[in-house]
Amino acid sequence: LHSTSRRQRQMCIRDRNYTYYVPHDVYGLARLMGGKKSFVNKLQMIFDEGLYDPANEPDIAYPYLFSYFKGEEWRTQKETQRLLAKYFTTQPDGIPGNDDTGTMSTWAIFNMMGFYPDCPGLPEYTLTTPVFDKVIIRLDPKWYKEKELVIESTRQKPDALYIDNVKIGGKKLNRFRITHDELVHGGRLEFSIR
């Protein structure tokens, strides 16, 4: 009896973890779950109850799902910063699970730069709060006419967490998603953090 109840709990946790793995149709999933508010509340519960598994690759895009819904982007920013601080350290066990050919390290680096490709095969990124003040990415001249992408962030105070505004190529971006072309051809991605 004990092993059955333990197995049922493990199945329940696994089912919750895989529920949100529909990266190609987040809006359709939200409709099936009762709409935006219900979707956001259920997703937040995964984080609040400690059910999010940072070592389980299908889960790693979950913090960005909030940003698909206007007004909920702050949750992405909060959760990615919390997860970086909790699970990615300079200790010997400073990466959750194993690195699976660099998957977890790449997750951390993308987040530290302020963007993440949350849907495989879709050339778009969700923006989140960068850790670094400045990052320069040198672009391959075989593929891009631009030489580099500069990412800069300025904080109104040292512990600022939330994005106040974003500019790409000097123009204000009024959303928290950016296409690959916008990113690599914009030259400069600027975050103002409040």
What are these regions (language model features)?
Residues M45-D48, D59:
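Membrane-embedded transmembrane-helix bundle of lipid-linked glycan/lipid transferases
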Residues R7-Q10, Y52-P58:
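Aromatic- and carboxylate-enriched substrate-binding clefts and catalytic-loop regions
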Residues R7-Q10, Y21, P120-G121:
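A post-motif C-terminal structural segment
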Residues L32-K36, G50-P54, P63-R194:
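Non-catalytic C-terminal accessory modules of carbohydrate-active enzymes
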Residues F39:
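Interdomain hinge/lid region at the active-site interface
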Residues R16-M33:
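A conserved active-site cap/scaffold subdomain adjacent to cofactor or substrate pockets
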Residues L1-R9, I13:
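Single conserved hydrophobic/aromatic residue that forms the stacking wall/gate
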Residues V26, L43-Q44, T80-L83:
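Short alpha-helical scaffolding segments that buttress acidic/His motifs in well-ordered protein cores
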